[in-house]
From Swiss-Prot:
Primary gene name: benB
Family: Belongs to the bacterial ring-hydroxylating dioxygenase beta subunit family.
Function text: Degradation of benzoate to 2-hydro-1,2-dihydroxybenzoate (DHB). The beta subunit may be responsible for the substrate specificity of the enzyme.
Pathway: Aromatic compound metabolism; benzoate degradation via hydroxylation; catechol from benzoate: step 1/2
Protein name: Benzoate 1,2-dioxygenase subunit beta
Amino acid sequence: MNATALLDTISIEQISQFLYSEARFLDDEQWDDWLECYAPQASFWMPAWDDNDQLTENPQTEISLIYYPDRQGLEDRVFRIKTERSSATMPDTRTAHNISNIEVESRDGLQITVRFNWNTLSFRYKNSYSYFGMSRYVIDFSGEQPKILSKYVMLKNDYINQVIDIYHI
């Protein structure tokens, strides 16, 4: 099948199923499967809101809530979670990710930019928390499995009373 024909076969349903799988891997703490959703060069960025209530624009020069320039940073984070070397994740946090309003913003060959809203419910220390926002992914569909090339997360309720981590969003 040529690339043009393959592009025409990538449906919003397939994109949605990929996004749902990534969320499920977080909810089920299937860390290795979750990492497999990401290309080696994948960036992961959640900018912070500045004092003027504007999002920061450069992860290299401004503060971010989370920033990993490539998958290696995610691998290190997962290693710490799995080996209980992260006090921020002890005890385990139970999560339920919900995704809505999935929209294809652009297609560039087999790379598709997707925007969606999300809400994550979290339970830890006998307390429930809710996080919500918008994410924009660039996903490469050229291989056997789709891979995230870029994950941008806008956390819309950033006044929180605990550490935010990769599994909250």
